A protein has these predicted regions:
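Conserved S-adenosyl-L-methionine
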Residues: 35-41, 193-202
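Adenosine-phosphate binding glycine-rich loop
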Residues: 140-174, 242-321
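Rossmann-like adenosine-cofactor binding region
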Residues: 79-105, 203-281
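Glycine-rich phosphate-binding loop and adjoining beta1-alpha1-beta2 segment
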Residues: 35, 39-66
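Histidine-anchored nucleotide/phosphate-binding helix
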Residues: 20-43
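Phosphate/diphosphate ligand-binding glycine-rich loop within oxidoreductases
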Residues: 85-168, 246, 250-258
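Glycine-rich adenosine-cofactor-binding loop
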Residues: 13-27, 143, 155-200
């Protein structure tokens, strides 16, 4: 964690950070903020399917103590006007969002919102960006390919984990990779190096011939509704009746797939617009890099260092739409 902070030169001194207390590898976020010198760290801890708020706070505090930050984090059950107004950086994290029109109205004008992911991954349900624009609240995504972050370097390993979990051996397996976004080379190259026979396409509507596939790895940009239609799944089922659909990114109509006779992995559907496998599935390092990168984006936005320092500007991605 310290190495990741030092790589990015993350310095939150004098700033109040409102973020989440979470489970799994996402436990690191408020601890990282404290380690980076934030003057105050507010962490929303909520009871959910992963554990109680009390358990989450206790686990986070144990990690904070191990990192020399015991007692630095304030755990809160929910956001409120007073605490949001005190925050300089409000992270777009699970227990904090949705960041609604009302919540944006509570923020002080100089507050900023790091999206905590790349800007093209933006989900409109996360942040009311129209309210942000009206209020002058700055927001931006993280450049996950920045040399000090390099989260994309883990995408191929994550895809391999998803394939292995589904029982697909990768080596000499025929895999149709559906990808229409910057993930493509980071998934494709490592799988090929593992011996997979990859056919890549931007969508299932492309002419992919009549070859049979062992698996269809779906890594499509989320949109309203499913990223692969019932007709497209029917075409796959005709030529690859035993193929498994792997939901890496992008929503899948699982009822339609079942009616067609195609299996979908993972067994439990992710939330709409979310990845089918978390980075924590391959260990904490990728998550640490991602969260430090998101906090760094928040720092750059708040200090407006992107205006005068091209190196600082490389950490953020403006939301264009």
């Amino acid at each position: 964690m310290r190495e990741a902070i030092e790589r990015c030169g993350l310095n939150l001194s004098g700033l109040t950070v409102l973020t989440e207390a979470a489970t799994g590898s996402y436990i690191v976020t408020p601890v990282l903020a404290a380690m980076a010198g934030a003057s105050r760290v507010l962490a929303v801890a909520r009871t959910n399917r992963y554990g109680s708020a009390e358990e989450t706070a206790a686990a986070t505090e144990a990690l904070a103590a191990a990192a020399g930050q015991g007692g630095r984090i304030e755990y809160i059950p929910e956001v409120n006007r007073e605490l949001v107004h005190r925050a300089d950086i409000v992270t777009n994290s699970g227990n904090v969002r949705p960041i609604t029109d009302e919540m944006v109205g509570w923020m002080k004008p100089e507050a900023v919102i790091p999206l905590m992911y790349e800007s093209w991954e933006f989900r409109a349900s996360d942040v009311d960006v129209d309210a942000c624009r009206r209020r002058g609240i700055a927001f931006a995504g993280t450049n996950e390919c920045h040399p000090a972050i390099q989260v994309f370097s883990y995408l191929g390993l994550l895809a391999a984990k998803l394939l292995f979990d589904a029982g697909v051996g990768i080596y000499q397996c025929r895999i149709l990779l559906l990808c229409d976004n910057p993930f493509l080379p980071y998934i494709e190259a490592p799988l090929k190096e593992c011996g997979a026979l990859i056919c890549s396409a931007a969508s299932a509507s492309e002419d992919i011939g009549t070859q049979a596939f062992d698996a269809v790895l779906i890594a499509m940009t989320p949109r309203a509704g499913a990223v692969i239609s019932a007709d497209e799944m029917c075409r796959i089922a005709v030529h690859s009746p035993g193929a498994v659909l792997l939901q890496y990114f992008g929503d899948v109509d699982r009822d339609a797939a079942a009616a067609i006779g195609l299996a979908v992995w993972p067994e439990d559907a992710p939330a709409p617009g979310h990845m089918g496998i978390l980075q924590s599935a391959i260990g904490p390092e990728a998550t640490i890099r991602l969260q430090v990168g998101g906090l760094k984006a928040g720092e750059v936005l708040y200090r407006r260092s992107y205006e005068s320092d091209p190196a600082a500007a490389e950490y953020i991605q403006p939301l264009l739409s």
